[in-house]
Regions:
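Bacterial N-terminal signal peptides that target proteins for export
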Residues: 1-9
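C-terminal motif of bacterial Sec signal peptides marking the signal peptidase cleavage site
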Residues: 18-21
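Short, conserved catalytic or interaction motifs in soluble domains
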Residues: 24
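Surface-exposed acidic/polar loop and edge beta-strand patches at domain peripheries
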Residues: 28-228, 234-243, 247-401
Length: 401
């Protein structure tokens, strides 16, 4: 046998050994305990591809910066998660959300997802054409309520009620919670990525007075995340519109008591109770009360239960700045309400949870309720061809010590 033939035989034997070695069982120490299969993240939720905007960090971990934003076009462009680098902590979840696999199981259109309700239980759902609650006359079957705007009847899903016996069903948080988005496009920018899309809402499933297009832009950069919605009346009748957002902001340390909240609102709307959370029409000055979070550095959340609406908002450089600070994590996030139409801020922060939902919105709760005695409650009137834009920006900061 030639030297060349011997070489080829040895090479073949080595190849066979190598392949067999790749298939051999792991050592007993590795296989003694069966390992659970890792959950496979879904590629779609709501019948549309999940969009993840990403960017590479540029500060070597020395300053706070946003890293990613996950958006669900199949669920009304819900901003499901945002991640950021925090010096000393590394990458953290900015929003309180389950895994994508768990979210897909919850966002299933079942009994707990009526009208898309599960969308506003985590992440950041957009609330159009009305944030908050709307009361009205309940239908005989208990499925809808009717209310009036400028003498015209509006029928809405009665998709929510409190937990107490006899709680009144009402409409809650808009009509796009489970909507699909058209023309979804992503673009790489100088310092991140942007996603855009349009919800051709029409008359919102027969519930609204005209036809509406909603144009979304979610922009990720290192120093900010911007969310913008423009609503345009593309129908033939005038219509009311309000826009809001329902992001659940994490408290990274998990220590809710020491977390601080700053809300530049001089009054809150009194509610009947924290189960219905229906406004009474009375606006109460916050000065001297536990609801006074106007100090520049805010005050600790401590054990205060919040599901309250602030108004008479003071602006800084034209924006309504609400701050959530976690001193234990050396972390702060600023929610800047840029649109002049933003009239109120709702904050939902139960003392047993490690988040604060900060909702910058156009309107008061139950905006057409008789309790307001004709007051301007923030609903914007769009005539055919008119539009209005809601714009909120998130900015990270390091709190002063």
């Amino acid at each position: 046998m030639s030297v060349r033939s011997q070489y080829l035989l040895l090479l073949a034997a080595a190849t066979v050994f190598s392949i067999a070695g790749c298939k051999q069982a792991p050592p007993p120490s590795e296989s003694a305990t069966p390992q659970p299969a890792a959950a496979i993240a879904p590629q779609q939720i709501g019948g549309q591809d999940i969009v993840k905007l990403e960017r590479k960090p540029t500060s070597d971990g020395q300053k706070p910066e946003f890293l990613s934003a996950t958006v669900l076009p199949g669920r009304g462009m819900n901003v499901f998660q945002i991640t950021a680098n925090i010096p000393g902590k590394g990458e953290v979840d900015v929003l309180a959300s389950p895994s994508l696999a768990d979210a897909a199981a919850k966002l299933n259109g079942g009994p707990d997802d009526q009208n898309g309700n599960a969308s506003f239980s985590f992440g950041g759902a957009f609330l159009v054409p009305y944030p908050n609650r709307i009361r009205g006359k309940l239908s005989a079957d208990g499925k809808t309520i009717t209310t009036e705007w400028e003498g015209k009847t509006i029928t809405l899903p009665a998709n929510w009620k409190g937990k107490n016996p006899g709680a009144e069903p009402h409409a809650m948080h808009g009509l796009i919670l489970a909507s699909k988005t058209d023309d979804v496009k992503t673009e790489t920018t100088a310092d991140g990525q942007t996603v855009t899309g349009t919800i051709h809402a029409g008359d919102f499933g027969g519930h609204w007075l005209s036809n509406t297009d909603l144009n979304f832009t979610i922009a990720l950069a290192g120093d900010a995340v911007d969310a913008t919605i423009t609503a345009k009346n593309v129908g033939n009748e005038a219509e009311p519109i309000a826009i809001g957002w329902h992001p659940y902001f994490n408290i990274p340390s998990g220590d809710r008591k020491q977390a601080r909240l700053h809300v530049p609102g001089e009054q809150t709307a009194q509610v009947n109770n924290y189960d219905d959370v229906f406004p009474t029409g009375k606006l109460i000055p916050v000065k001297g009360t536990k609801y006074d979070f106007t100090a520049p550095d805010g005050k600790p959340l401590d054990d205060i239960f919040l599901d309250d609406n602030w108004s008479k908002l003071q602006r800084t450089d034209g924006a309504v700045d609400v701050d959530l600070t976690d001193p234990a994590s050396n972390y702060g996030i600023k929610v800047e309400g840029i649109s002049p139409e933003i009239k109120t801020v709702q904050v939902y922060a139960p003392p047993t949870k490690e988040f604060a939902a900060i909702e910058e919105q156009f309107n008061f709760g139950d905006p057409w309720g008789k309790e307001w005695h004709g007051m301007d409650t923030g609903m914007v009137t769009l005539k055919p061809g008119q539009s209005v834009t809601w714009h909120v920006r998130l900015v990270l900061f390091t709190p002063l010590k």
